[in-house]
Amino acid sequence: MCIRRQQPGLLELEHGGRRWRLGINICEDLWVEEELHGQRLRGGDPVGELQALRPDLLLNLSASPFAQGKAQLRRRLAAAAAARLGCPVVYVNQVGGNDELVFDGGSFVVAATGAVRLQLDWAEPDLQVWDTALDPARTTIPLPDPEDLLLRTLVLGLRDYARKCGFRRALLGLSGGIDSALVAVLAAAALGPGNVQALLMPSPWSSAGSIEDSLALAQRLGIATGTVPIAALMAGFDAALNEPLAGPPAGLTAENLQSRIRGTLLMALANQQGQLLLSTGNKSELAVGYCTLYGDMNGGLAVIGDLYKTSVFRLCAWIDSPAAAACRQALGLPAEGELVGGAIREKPPSAELRPDQRDSDSLPDYDQLDPLLKALIEEQRSPEELIATGTDAALAERVQGLLRRAEFKRRQAAPLLKVSNRAFGSGWRMPIAAAG
């Protein structure tokens, strides 16, 4: 770990007939309370060093990217500093997306009592005035729902990524599943429904329900759709490969061909029409390799590549709840009724690459898989540690093996929007050849 260190500063100025002593520190200079954060990110004690300077106010200048649960932690760290210094803390955070990182804003003022007295907007530029003369009440401004913060952050990340890469329009494949449905919602909010196109690519194994659900979702969002059936293309590949394979492709080869046919169609349309192709895979799939190189992994941005499947279900359930109405309206989405839809949220996950296929045919149930993945990835625990605390040994070793063997796919994956403490991409460096 690289420890960055800045000397605490003090700025003195005249205002309102009195002399003010403003303490100044940078971002993780606040992160010195190991009992709050779990680790000490700074050498020394930048907050303690400011105590001798007796500031009237501490200004913390941050460029702190979003991670789930981090908003509450920032408040706790700022409140701890305010209590030690006996003065308010003004926490000022950057807002905007920069590649994988999304800076979610949410600047605030916490009084010496620990109460949050001013809260600026999330995932949007904001400017407000705080009157230091007001008596700091002990009541605090509550945080928004965690799903509200997550939704706004993903929308901001997608919008800024597209804008900074020179794209106004986006394309995605719409399958009738929950992952592509969530990406469609995010794209409509980030770019406007008129700038989003969804392509349906049904195969002989696609259910009528998946097609109907996709079209209904697109209608609710107001996004354009197109349909290109892939049965004839599948037959063409079967014929072309029949002689060299001594028979048509079968099993996993045939399934991957379907995904690659779809990926090629999407890339061709995006290329011809000048659109940003959005990959719709989730973190669970990327972790265990339940995805196809040059197929469903195609895209310029993996919008939900840092969301586990269970998190996708949870966020979609919140989006469809009355609690999301204000957030949806603020993002330019319809405020009433379901967006994702119960039919999509409640269907068993399936890639529909063979008859009656379910994700659970190849993987543990996501309720089992995702906590294990989080322990292995974010918490950096070993299978031995998990087994010692009661995890089934065969399951822990199987999931660890899947995680290691999928590294070659992740190395070629599209960049994603980081919303956890440890995401795949630039913050994840593992060897490909250590998968045995």
What are these regions (language model features)?
Residues 20, 86-87, 112, 138-175, ...:
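ATP/NTP-dependent adenylation/nucleotidyl-transfer catalytic domains that generate, transfer
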Residues 1-173, 189-190, 225:
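Enzyme catalytic cores with a strong preference for nitrogen-chemistry domains
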